[in-house]
Regions:
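Core dinuclear metal-dependent hydrolase active-site scaffold
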Residues: 1-53, 123-209, 220, 279-295
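Active-site environment of divalent metal-dependent phosphoester hydrolases
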Residues: 18, 38-40, 63-69, 90-93, ...
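Ser/Thr-centric signal marking residues that sit
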Residues: 26, 61, 198, 269-270
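Active-site metal-binding motif and surrounding structural segment of the metallo-beta-lactamase
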Residues: 39-90, 207-220, 234-239
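Metal-dependent catalytic neighborhoods of phosphoester/phosphodiester hydrolases
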Residues: 44, 68-80, 94-103, 225-230, ...
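Structural beta-sheet core signal
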Residues: 58, 193-194, 241-243
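Binuclear metal-ion centers of metallo-dependent hydrolases, dominated by the metallo-beta-lactamase
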Residues: 81-146, 235-295
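C-terminal or late-domain output modules
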Residues: 191, 203, 208-212, 221-233, ...
């Protein structure tokens, strides 16, 4: 199992927010977690060609542009089999949302609001197979969606769609707060947790599984501090942390996190691509054969 968190360090354009793009290569299947820009998408295609993958599955943590905008390019290239995403137009979710909102609005109004808020997801239309990520499915061997918990997610969405309510959870927008989280079983038997821009309350139940953690919202330090405290309280020693952040203090940002001395093992994409789980080559030369000894 190899996970690669893309960096934009070597891109010529230093002003553009290229967003997140994370590849999960099981050795037999490829899963893409977010793709925020066409530049990242082009690198995904190059990786697939080199590794011999013709198709990949895609998990969309949420529909913000810095996580979504490279996806249409990949779909047009014909390499995406399924997109795991938030599909709130399903009747079972609409009924629950209306119930949470006290039937304050009619179903037709709710449908319009969902289509407006998640227009980029539904713009994918019939071009790719969309899979309901709220059912927390297994994507392939060793890769599964494990959060957010359904009721908590729908409560948050209802708050967002009800214009009488606020649009934040734990200081994050609802779009960010309910990001889909991914659990990956690494070759050492430990697990990695990908969080997108999730709010702390949404990732907290899943921290116990993880020895490798992508810090949410590009390393936003307020969330990182809570995660550090949570792991410390459970005496989880040796956890490794990763920050996908190519824009500094914008979009959450890791600059403040860098200036604080937390004494944690944190790696940043500002220093380049981050490979996780990549096997190191042996320093020893083996396997040579010089033939039989001539007498």
């Amino acid at each position: 199992m190899k996970v690669t968190i893309f960096s934009s360090k070597d891109y010529n354009d230093k002003k553009t927010n290229f967003g997140d793009c994370i590849l999960i290569d099981t050795g037999t299947s490829l899963v893409i977690y977010d793709c925020g820009h066409q530049k990242h998408a082009e690198r995904v295609l190059a990786y697939m060609k080199k590794a011999g993958y013709k198709k990949a599955d895609f998990i969309l943590s949420h529909n913000d542009s810095d996580h979504f905008d490279g996806l249409p390019y990949l779909i047009e290239a014909g390499v995406i089999s399924h997109v795991y995403t938030l599909l709130l137009l399903k009747e079972k979710y609409r009924k629950k949302l209306l119930q949470i909102m006290g039937n304050y609005i009619k179903d037709e109004t709710l449908v319009k609001r969902i289509k407006t808020e998640y227009d980029n997801i539904y713009s994918l239309g019939n071009s790719v197979t969309l899979v309901d990520a709220l059912e927390l499915p297994s994507v392939c061997t060793g890769v599964s969606i494990i959060g957010p918990e359904l009721d908590a997610a729908l409560e948050a969405v209802a708050k967002h769609l009800d214009n009488r309510e606020g649009n934040t959870l734990d200081g994050e927008t609802i779009h960010n707060a309910i990001c889909f989280q991914v659990k990956i079983k690494m070759d050492d038997g430990k697990h990695m947790l990908l969080c997108g821009d999730s709010a702390f309350s949404m990732v907290e139940p899943n921290l116990k599984y993880a020895s490798y953690i992508q810090l949410p919202h590009h390393g936003k330090y307020e969330i990182a501090e809570k995660i550090f405290e949570c792991k410390d309280s459970h005496k989880h020693i040796g956890t490794k942390y990763y920050v996908s952040d190519n824009t500094g203090t914008t979009n959450g940002g890791s600059d403040t996190l860098k200036t604080k001395d937390y004494g944690r093992d944190v790696t940043y994409t500002t220093d380049g691509d981050i490979p996780v789980g990549e096997k190191k080559s042996s320093p020893y030369v083996t396997g040579k054969s010089y033939g039989e000894l001539i007498r």
